[in-house]
Design a protein with these regions (language model features):
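Conserved acidic donor-binding segment of nucleotide-sugar-dependent glycosyltransferases
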Residues: 155-156, 160-167, 176-181
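Aromatic "clamp/platform" in nucleotide-sugar-dependent glycosyltransferases that forms part
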Residues: 123
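Nucleotide-activated donor-binding/catalytic signature segment of Leloir-type glycosyltransferases, i.e.
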Residues: 76-103
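Short hydrophobic beta-strand element within catalytic cores of glycosyltransferases
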Residues: 140-143, 153
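Conserved donor-binding/catalytic core segment of Leloir-type glycosyltransferases
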Residues: 22-38, 44-47, 63-64
Length: 195
């Protein structure tokens, strides 16, 4: 299980203030190692199709990626990080995707709580601790139906499950949740109860 003394819902405004995010800014979060199995490329592609559907300047949505290396010289960057960066460039994502690098474990509850949605687009995942941590913080999760994630996330209750490597399906679920704050809050509450 998850340590609920460490991972619990923090009021979003407080969490956003702690991590330096403006209250109106909306964050979709990925936490994990930057490696091909994690499917971050799928998430970036989903974000790019999201940008087309929801041009909303009042409450800009961005994707924050925690894990791997922060902004380092390209030659020091892992191949996967360079590949993801190139996908961002090719899709003209601009500032919509932010690589935050590693973050201290004790700051993670603030990131989870500040996020509208946590996404785990993995191609394989034995258990999915990050999903459980986010849920304990009251954040709905959209995850691939792989390994333990299919069991952890109750589709339509605590979040959504989507096929892996399917940016369109992921984009559709992101749009639904981003567009419906009541549904997000309800799923978040159920997620926290479940965790």
């Amino acid at each position: 299980g998850v340590d609920t003394e460490h991972f619990y819902p923090i009021p979003p405004d407080e969490a956003k203030q702690f991590i330096g995010l403006q209250p109106e800014n909306r964050m979709i979060l990925f936490v994990g190692r930057i490696e091909p199995l994690k499917g971050v490329d799928t998430l970036i592609k989903a974000m790019s199709c999201l940008g087309i559907d929801t041009p909303n300047k009042e409450s800009p949505v961005h994707l924050a990626i925690i894990g791997g290396e922060p902004d380092v010289n390209p030659q020091d960057m892992s191949e996967e990080m360079a590949r993801l960066q190139k996908i961002c460039d090719d899709l003209c994502m601009g500032g919509m995707v932010v690589f935050l690098g590693k973050r201290a474990q004790d700051t993670l509850p603030y990131y989870y709580s500040a996020a509208e949605i946590l996404v785990m687009p993995s191609l394989y995942e034995s258990f999915g601790m990050v999903a459980l941590e986010a849920m304990a913080c009251g954040t709905p999760v959209i995850a691939s139906e792989v390994g333990g994630l299919g069991y952890l996330v109750q589709d339509g209750v605590t979040g959504y499950t989507v096929p892996d490597s399917a940016p369109e399906a992921l984009c559709e679920k992101l749009s639904i949740l981003l567009g419906n704050s009541d549904l997000r809050n309800e799923m978040g509450m159920k997620a926290a109860e479940y965790a």
